Amino acid sequence: MLSKQVTKIVQNLEKKKFREKYNLFKIEGEKLVGELLHSPLKIHSLIAFPSWLEQNKKALSNVNIIEADEREMHGISNFQSLPEVIALAEIPVHIYRKEEVLDSLSLVLNGIQDPGNLGTILRVADWFGIGNIFCDADCAGVYNPKCVQASMGAIFRVKTFYTDLSVLLSELKQEGLPVFGTFLDGKNIYTTALSTRGLIVMGNEG
């Protein structure tokens, strides 16, 4: 049974201040939760229908499990079609390693305020094998539920950092790391041979 306290916590995770307070974020749906179970992230709890728990019980050792019915799931889900499972995971602490950034391709995001767009960018970055993503304070939160959903699991694999981009770019340019900009009339990234190291800078939507 889903308690009122847990229901309130899950509902509050829509807001950044509560995600920071509890150090948790929400993952909805069978596919994303399936990816979460195979990721290194620490799962705080799983809220699910009994049928889903029975089908997946072999993968659920050492996980705090809460059974829920349809009425209870309606109260905590953003989906129009109810998911069978919702997970709460701890927000990971990513360690910045300069030597790793200097030897790879990273993404720098300025003012990406729409969480859905940010999640899509994370997904594309993951597809290209980009592992480090730097955001400024004007970007949406990467653990916003809309961003998590749009990332389609990339959020479990890429490392994200919020930082002063001018300081970061200055420091890494001094180390000789090339910087690439994105433009509407530029070359198609899908048909362009990318460097194996450097910073790709993307600006805001507007």
Predicted regions and their residues:
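Active-site regions of enzymes building and remodeling cell-envelope glycoconjugates
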Residues: 59-69, 104, 193-199
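Generic beta-sheet signal
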Residues: 49, 68-69, 88, 136, ...
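Boundary-proximal intrinsically disordered activation/regulatory segments immediately upstream
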Residues: 1-54, 139-140
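RNA substrate-binding interface of SAM-dependent RNA methyltransferases
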Residues: 38, 98-189
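Active-site/ligand-binding-proximal alpha/beta "capping" segment
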Residues: 181-206
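Short, hinge-like loop/turn segments at secondary-structure boundaries
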Residues: 85, 150-154, 197-200
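Short active-site oxyanion
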Residues: 21-24, 42-45, 62-64, 132-133, ...
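Glycine/small-residue-rich loop that forms an oxyanion/phosphate-binding "nest" at active or ligand-binding sites
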Residues: 63-90
